[in-house]
Amino acid sequence: RREILAGLADGSIDLCIGTHALLTEDVQYARLGLVITDEQHRFGVGQRAALSKKAASPHMLVLSATPIPRTLALIIYGDLDVSVIDELPPGRQRVDTFAVNESYRQRLNGFIRRQVAQGHQVFIVCPLIAEDDQLPDERKAVAAYADKLRREVFPDLRIAVLHGRMKAREKEAVMAAFAAGESDILVSTTVVEVGVDVPNANLMVVENAERFGLSQLHQLRGRVGRGSAKSWCILLSDSENEDTRRRLRVLTETNDGFKISEEDLKLRGPGDFFGQRQHGLPTLKAADLSCDMRLLDEAQTAACALLAQDPTLADPAHGALRRRIDRLFAVNEGGLN
């Protein structure tokens, strides 16, 4: 680490790939010119503020496979140009999604077996790693459920297990074996949500789907349909809760991540949508972010025009606005991040 820090500081390192560690205080850059942030939804505005202190004005490219509503994009990324890739790569097919309850279990098991017999592989995602006696419900746990599948349901199939408590080397070995076709079924937690590319896997089964958010389910669905074969996502839930049924119904009706994110916004609101990772969003008393798209567009245009005329809001006529912004974002030393 010491050598890398020295190389970044003196400019002898041209390209550095890393995690949030690149934003810590002890990391200094000689001439930071370009920052590419992958999985941007996993970074908060705090990280963006930290990055702004590393260089005067580096070029920035942020990428995210988890769409956010365009209404919120205008607020969170108002200083960036937003480009959308909303088409499937050539050769890929739409993933068909079904929400079913436990009464479909036997049919589902038969469907899993047929897919494996045809040479494909299957993801099964559970909400828990291990069973907890303090949680006397019917939530599936990875370890116990995989054992049950091996003993009672698919004793002749190759079943692997993957979860976050495994050592990094173990996880890498399991994923490499699955990608190489050495296992038929991977029973996992949401650790497979991002960064997994197995084109031969064409079936995603999500147990206790009511335990997951819409965006998370959409990400999990994205683990299949990465090859040319027809793919499916099965959402299992016995919940009778109307909000849950509505959420799952959205996924069965569309594969459009932006429509899904808009629905997520309606269901959870902007605060819960981003959680503590994205602070600074005002509590709105009248506006509705899911409906007031035109008004937000006009507000952004007006804000850009104002900042072009008075970038620091130094004009006395803009004093009240400046003070309001300072209070809203708790700005220190009069600087905007």
Regions found by a protein language model. Give the residues of each.
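C-terminal accessory region of SF2 helicases/translocases
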Residues: 232, 240-337
